[in-house]
């Protein structure tokens, strides 16, 4: 019987749908949902606990309180199903219907819906073309609005206050109709003729000239068209009927002691009903107008509070002074419906416990406490016990399990066998935060975790907890095993390098066993094979570090993948020979014949994975770990105070530095240097001293003297414990050792500036009170930073995931020929990232030719793997065009060729891979390692001494790139441009290093000169910024009036004077607009001209510039006319770390961005206006010149008569990404953003593949702005999805009509997420109210294309294994079948997907 009942209960129909539409509900619709009108504010009878009739919980409207039982008890039992009791009027049904049935309230006076009124831009306001303020005055009964002017002089929509209204009444009588309140607004909305208005607006827009007006009109037009297209009627934005939520969704729960806990909604509904009933009564009584108005206003406020409390005026509070939670609050925010219940649910079959180390586990195992396993696998155990006949019923089985009988444990062991469980550590920052393991039953209460997966989880064993989840269905177990098993996740999806890498003890052990020692026991022995070495070591004949000869048999994998055996005798050490025993066949002996540091081990595992494949690598990783643990135990490495050896030179270096500082102080005292220069120099000095001390210390620590076999004393690498730990990469770094045994160095003040006096002591010597006090600041700041960082980093990840969540690989090849040009990333003198690393795992977009010929060496469409990278290196290829997510032409999603290699698997990416989410996680996960600080120039205490020259590292040929220069009298070049660069090319013509040359640098070589390694080729003063003359002549001062524009500074210590230009802000009124300058004149007093132009040579001086010349002095080409101290020249804060990454992804415009040339042409300066300069660029083709006003304080890099190209920098500053996109195009923007973000991560030593950043950038470039509408339906200035424009243009192309023209637009990630096609996704991200309001008005459809939408509606996501389900549905939809994918069909599709991904 019970089963029958359950059957009846579960008869809910599963709705089939492809899209979700949101719209406005008409009053008729609300009434059709309703099961009756709620007339009374009562809830339940407090004595009988029965719902009051016609009240908010009325059983007649909403259904019975108990299953199949009417309220008065006349009808009970199933047989009366569907009967309506004539006594109490309740239908006999399931109590569950109280969750579904809605009621309604008939409002006595219409009420405006607050969302469409107050959510900006106000939709009601836009439609009526009235301001929000005016509409509110009408709604809240302060003014009348004219609805129908009739034959009078009034206008429709005009506001009248009481006086004006009565005057009009006297004048016109009943000829016009003016009202107030929501009725008036309702009438006005009702009277709108959409078609007529749309036609009028479309005519009006082309005839308008003002930009703002066009914007306003097109906004209105868009809204009107949205209403017309969606079938919503404008008057529905004013409610006449209010729906009432089903009572079980706003429950009233009796607590003990006769009190009740109630949902806030009930209070809000009660207020509405009370006020509505009172208004009805007042209207029946024909009460005075002023009372009715007040009541109507109160009703409006009550409905406002119910829909969105606190949106207008003060929030209504309950009995406990807390604002009541309205309907809008239910859905928005972290605790709202979307983020709390739809996107994140709590799950059953899970447990959590503390983790401990499991050094004996295999990589695919985890130790699960028996207690936990018993609880987690209960149902399985019950089933097994019953199936075996050990227990007769489930109840009996339950008893057995509770008693923990011995047979239960046997069954448990069987159930658990090969049933993977998922382990998750919060915070789950990337997909490796959840992995699958096979459980091994253990005693105790802590979960055991394999040490090698700690890096992926970012786990340590200081009390971390982890959660266990059980995949129940067969499919879930299959996915856990095939995709999530820890052994299948060896490589990190962020950069394609192994993430299963030994650390700490294991590294220490492997390093220790592969080090060599001079004259160790057994040195010089020779062994026939590895077994002999093992015996010699075990019997104590040979030490672990002894140099010996060994004959080894290695099997090496050739190019063809075949193993070839090879026997040779090698020089090695005992430890390395022992280590080779665990190396899999296929790797040569050379991989272990070195001291194994952390980097080398990582490289070894990576190499192993590429050569011998996954299975052997996993076994090898385990063996490495066991070996490492064993030998680090044997080594007995530990730290004692005597390990910190302080170098003898320390005192000498510090004394020398102190003397030099004194020297600088005396220079300052005699006025040779300014305060700022002194500060800089002192800090540079101490930085240098610190470096020297640490060099001396490391040199001291890293070598020790020993006696070799001949009895001579020789140096060998030290076995100092501390040095070994740092050198191997197990723990600690040179910087930390420096603080322990060198000197602590410079410290920063709370505001980030550096304290001039460093801490000269180290921790071994101990700090005195002052030094300790200075140190405390940094330590505290570190802790405060970490807390901030975590939150910010998490928020960045959330925004990234949101913007990229619907990017999935949907096809193999989009067929595009575009791509990005990749060249090695050179910075300063170093190749930071060689070409090989940048193109690895990418697909070539255009054929690569052999340098200097037209022979194709790599055809387009090749996926570049490690072999191809080596080949490109050999052929010395300089640049390659590769396919990129940014240039991919797939409409929805992205194609596998443009993405290239799946970094975590090492082959081409599968269809269905959620590359967007992976990109977001890869960028967000290291976020917590980035710093939060903004550095001032000269900020970080770890700052290196400022560069003041270019010293080349490699020999080669000099190349100068876009360098403008003048030649000094002595033949040296002086740079007079800011974008100049100097590069050194090797004999093949490949660039090996590249340096930026600042303005004023003195360059001692010419283009094409040969230089030797180590030569200094350029010099400059790092602390001041010079202004250099380009002609010979005599100095004449212009506009330099003492006390008005300049002040003569006499250094009080020295009596020397120089002239300093005052900041315009500090000048008296007379000097505000004067621009002091130094101009050059010839002997006759005529202006000299800049070479090659007709522009006079005069140099305008920015604020704070220092002039050391006197009026009338002689200067020659390349001399310095004035200096701008670098400290005072606007200290631009370098935003570092996380905030910088966020700024780039949000595409924020910097405060004072660099100014770029809008067009190519010749520079000239027009008439000046107040405080601004007029820059004119005249194009060379004779078209219209371009003018721009630039503030006077901006330092311009261009002079009159200079040629510039479009997009060249005119005035320095941080770049504005929007300008780069507009003037230089998508690929320049991609290059800029990728490099900027990579710089931040690289500084912290984090590797992220470029394509993740490009993937996010693709999402930021989704929208375009229509510049000409052509014959399309778009309006000029619209922001539309690129795909929409392309589709419509294709359509127009087939009909021979004019396509729309457009410009790409860059949106920040928050904005891009909110402007996605899917309103469900946008609403669950941020600004829920605004998104839903907009979607409802336009009647939006959500086609459930992304991942988030599908999670919200509870479907499989269209990615990974779920893609098969979705494409099967789509196929059936196209065939016109009903959309029910049967289990077998889905399974077939799934197996196919899994098989294809396995290959």
Curated annotation (Swiss-Prot):
A Pfam short name: RNA_pol_Rpb1_1
Top EC category: transferase
Region forming the signal peptide: none
Residues that coordinate or bind Mg(2+): 460, 462, 464
Residues annotated for Zn(2+) 2 binding in this entry: 814, 888, 895, 898
CDD domains assigned to the protein according to its UniProt record, in alphabetical order: RNAP_beta'_C, RNAP_beta'_N
The UniProt record lists the keyword Ribonucleoprotein: no
Record field: catalytic activity: RNA(n) + a ribonucleoside 5'-triphosphate = RNA(n+1) + diphosphate
Cellular component GO terms held in the UniProt record: DNA-directed RNA polymerase complex
EC number from the UniProt entry: 2.7.7.6
Residue intervals passing through the bilayer: none
Binding site for Zn(2+) 1: 70, 72, 85, 88
A biological process term (GO) from this entry: DNA-templated transcription
A GO molecular function held by the record: DNA binding
Domain of life: Bacteria
InterPro entries (UniProt xref): DNA-dir_RpoC_beta_prime, DNA-dir_RpoC_beta_prime_bact, RNA_pol_asu, RNA_pol_N, RNA_pol_Rpb1_1, RNA_pol_Rpb1_3, RNA_pol_Rpb1_3_sf, RNA_pol_Rpb1_4
Functional note: DNA-dependent RNA polymerase catalyzes the transcription of DNA into RNA using the four ribonucleoside triphosphates as substrates.
PANTHER family: DNA-DIRECTED RNA POLYMERASE (PTHR19376), DNA-DIRECTED RNA POLYMERASE SUBUNIT BETA (PTHR19376:SF54)
Summary of subunit composition and partner proteins: The RNAP catalytic core consists of 2 alpha, 1 beta, 1 beta' and 1 omega subunit. When a sigma factor is associated with the core the holoenzyme is formed, which can initiate transcription.
Protein name stated in the entry: DNA-directed RNA polymerase subunit beta'
Gene name of this polypeptide: rpoC
């Amino acid at each position: 019987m019970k089963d029958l009942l359950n059957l009846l209960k579960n008869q809910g129909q599963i709705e089939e749908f492809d899209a979700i539409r949101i719209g406005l509900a008409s009053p008729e619709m609300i009434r059709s949902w309703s099961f009756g009108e709620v007339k009374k504010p009562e809830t339940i009878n407090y004595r009988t606990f029965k719902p009051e009739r016609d009240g908010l919980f009325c059983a007649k409207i909403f259904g019975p309180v108990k299953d199949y039982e009417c309220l008065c008890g006349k009808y009970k039992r199933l047989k009366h199903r569907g009967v309506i009791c004539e006594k109490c009027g309740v239908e006999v049904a399931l109590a569950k219907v109280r969750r579904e049935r809605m009621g309604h309230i008939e409002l006595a006076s219409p009420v405006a819906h607050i969302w469409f009124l107050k959510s900006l831009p106000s939709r009601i306001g836009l439609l009526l073309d009235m301001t929000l303020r005016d509409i509110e005055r009408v709604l809240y009964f302060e003014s009348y609005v004219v609805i129908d002017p009739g034959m009078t002089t009034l206008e429709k929509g005009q506001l009248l206050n009481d006086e004006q209204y009565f005057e009009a009444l006297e004048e016109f009588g009943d000829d016009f109709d003016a009202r107030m309140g929501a009725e008036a607004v309702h009438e006005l909305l009702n009277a709108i003729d959409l078609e007529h208005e749309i036609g009028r607006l479309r005519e009006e827009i082309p005839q308008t000239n003002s930009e703002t007006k066009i914007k306003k009109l097109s906004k209105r037009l868009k809204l009107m068209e949205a209403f017309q297209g969606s079938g919503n009627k404008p008057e529905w934005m004013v409610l006449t009927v209010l729906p009432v939520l089903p009572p079980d969704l706003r429950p009233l729960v009796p607590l003990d002691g006769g009190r009740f806990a109630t949902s806030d909604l009930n209070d809000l509904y009660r207020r509405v009903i009370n006020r509505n009933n009172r208004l009805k009564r007042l209207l029946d009584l024909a009460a005075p107008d002023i009372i009715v108005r007040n009541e109507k206003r109160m009703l409006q406020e009550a409905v406002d509070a119910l829909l969105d409390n606190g949106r207008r005026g003060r929030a209504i509070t309950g009995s406990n002074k807390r604002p009541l939670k309205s309907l809008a609050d239910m859905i928005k925010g972290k605790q709202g419906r979307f983020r709390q219940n739809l996107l994140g649910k709590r799950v059953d079959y899970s447990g959590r416990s503390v983790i401990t180390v499991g050094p004996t586990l295999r990589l695919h195992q985890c130790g699960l406490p028996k207690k936990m396993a018993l609880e987690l696998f209960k149902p399985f155990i019950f089933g097994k016990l019953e199936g075996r006949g050990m227990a007769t019923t489930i109840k009996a089985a339950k008893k057995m399990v509770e008693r923990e009988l011995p047979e239960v444990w046997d069954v448990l062991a069987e159930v658990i066998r090969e049933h993977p469980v998922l382990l998750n550590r919060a915070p789950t920052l990337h997909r490796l935060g959840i992995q699958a393991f096979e459980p091994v039953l253990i005693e105790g209460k802590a979960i055991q975790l394999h040490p090698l997966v700690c890096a992926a989880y970012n786990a340590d064993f200081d009390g971390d907890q982890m959660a266990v989840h059980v995949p129940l269905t067969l499919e879930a177990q299959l996915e856990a095993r095939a995709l999530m098993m820890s052994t299948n996740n060896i490589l990190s999806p962020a950069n394609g390098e192994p993430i299963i890498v030994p650390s700490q003890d294991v590294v220490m052990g492997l390093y220790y066993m592969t080090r060599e020692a001079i004259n160790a026991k057994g040195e010089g022995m020779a062994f026939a094979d590895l077994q002999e070495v093992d015996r010699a070591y075990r019997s104590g004949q040979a030490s672990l570090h002894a140099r010996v000869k060994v004959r080894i048999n290695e099997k090496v994998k050739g190019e063809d993948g075949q193993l070839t055996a090879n026997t040779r005798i090698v020089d090695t050490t005992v430890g390395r020979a022992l280590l080779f025993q665990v190396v899999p066949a296929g790797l040569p002996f050379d991989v272990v014949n070195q001291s194994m540091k952390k980097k080398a081990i990582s490289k070894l595992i990576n190499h192993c994975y590429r050569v011998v494949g996954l299975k052997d690598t996993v076994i090898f990783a385990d063996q490495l770990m066991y070996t490492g643990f064993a030998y680090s135990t044997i080594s007995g490495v530990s730290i004692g105070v005597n390990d910190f050896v302080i170098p003898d030179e320390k005192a000498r270096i510090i004394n020398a530095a102190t003397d030099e500082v004194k020297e600088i102080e005396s220079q300052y005292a005699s006025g040779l240097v300014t305060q700022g220069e002194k500060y800089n120099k002192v800090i540079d000095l101490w930085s240098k001293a610190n470096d020297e001390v640490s060099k001396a210390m490391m040199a001291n620590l890293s070598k020790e003297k020993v006696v070799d076999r001949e009895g001579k004393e020789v140096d060998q690498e030290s076995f100092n414990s501390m040095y070994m730990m740092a050198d191997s990469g197990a723990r600690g770094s040179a910087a930390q050792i420096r603080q322990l045994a060198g000197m602590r160095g410079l410290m920063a003040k709370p505001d980030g500036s550096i304290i001039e006096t460093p801490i000269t002591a180290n921790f071994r010597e101990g700090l005195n009170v002052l030094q300790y006090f200075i140190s405390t600041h940094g330590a505290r700041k570190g802790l405060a930073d970490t807390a901030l960082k975590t939150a910010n980093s998490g928020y960045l990840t959330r925004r990234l995931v949101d913007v990229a969540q619907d990017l999935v690989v949907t096809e193999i090849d989009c067929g595009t020929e575009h791509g990005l040009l990749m060249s090695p990333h050179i910075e300063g003198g170093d190749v930071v990232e060689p070409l090989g690393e940048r193109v690895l795992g990418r697909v070539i977009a255009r054929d690569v030719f052999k340098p200097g010929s037209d022979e194709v060496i790599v055809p387009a469409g090749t996926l570049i793997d490690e072999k191809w990278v080596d080949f490109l290196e050999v052929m010395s290829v300089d640049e390659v065009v590769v396919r990129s997510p940014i240039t991919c032409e797939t409409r929805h999603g992205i194609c596998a060729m443009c993405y290239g290699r799946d970094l975590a698997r090492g082959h081409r990416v599968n269809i269905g891979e959620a590359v967007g989410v992976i990109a977001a996680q890869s960028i967000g996960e290291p976020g917590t390692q980035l710093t939060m600080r903004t550095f001032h120039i000269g900020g970080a205490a770890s700052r290196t001494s400022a560069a003041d020259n270019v010293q080349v590292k490699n020999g080669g040929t000099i190349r100068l790139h876009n360098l403008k220069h003048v030649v000094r009298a002595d033949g040296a070049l002086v740079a007079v441009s800011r974008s100049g660069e100097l590069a050194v090319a090797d004999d093949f013509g490949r660039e090996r290093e590249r340096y930026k040359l600042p303005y004023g640098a003195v360059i001692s070589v010419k283009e094409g000169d040969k230089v030797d390694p180590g030569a200094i080729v350029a010099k400059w003063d790092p602390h001041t910024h010079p202004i250099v003359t380009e002609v010979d002549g005599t100095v004449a001062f212009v506009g330099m009036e003492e006390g008005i524009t300049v002040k003569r500074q006499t250094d009080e210590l020295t009596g020397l004077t120089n002239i300093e230009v005052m900041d315009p802000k500090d000048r008296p009124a007379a000097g505000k607009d004067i621009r002091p300058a130094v101009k050059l004149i010839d002997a006759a007093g005529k202006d000299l001209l800049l070479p090659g132009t007709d522009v006079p040579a005069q140099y305008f001086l920015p604020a704070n510039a220092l002039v050391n010349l006197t009026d009338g002095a002689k200067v020659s080409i390349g001399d310095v006319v004035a200096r701008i101290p670098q400290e005072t020249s606007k200290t631009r804060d370098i935003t570092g770390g996380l905030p910088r990454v966020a700024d780039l992804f949000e595409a924020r415009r910097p405060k004072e961005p660099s100014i770029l040339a809008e067009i190519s042409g010749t520079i000239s300066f027009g008439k000046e206006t107040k405080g601004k300069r007029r820059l004119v660029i005249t194009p060379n083709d004779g078209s219209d010149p371009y003018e721009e006003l630039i503030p006077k304080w901006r330092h311009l890099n261009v002079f009159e008569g200079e040629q510039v190209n479009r997009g060249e920098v005119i005035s320095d500053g941080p770049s504005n990404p929007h300008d780069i996109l507009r003037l230089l195009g998508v690929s320049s923007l991609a290059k800029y953003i990728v490099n900027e973000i990579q710089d931040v991560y690289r500084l912290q030593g984090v590797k992220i593949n470029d394509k993740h950043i490009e993937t996010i950038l693709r999402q930021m470039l989704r929208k375009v702005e229509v510049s000409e509408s052509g014959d399309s339906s778009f309006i000029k200035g619209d922001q539309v999805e690129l795909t929409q424009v392309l589709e419509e243009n294709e359509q127009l192309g087939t009909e021979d009509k004019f396509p729309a023209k457009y410009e790409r637009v860059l949106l920040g990630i928050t904005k891009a997420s909110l402007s996605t096609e899917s309103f469900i996704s946008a609403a669950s991200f941020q600004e829920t109210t605004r998104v839903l309001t907009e979607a409802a008005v336009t009647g939006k459809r959500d086609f459930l294309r992304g991942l988030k939408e599908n999670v919200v509606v509870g479907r499989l996501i269209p990615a990974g294994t779920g893609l098969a389900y979705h494409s099967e549905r789509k196929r059936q939809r196209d065939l016109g079948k009903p959309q029910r994918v049967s289990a077998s069909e889905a399974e077939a599709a799934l197996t196919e997907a899994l098989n294809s991904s396995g290959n």
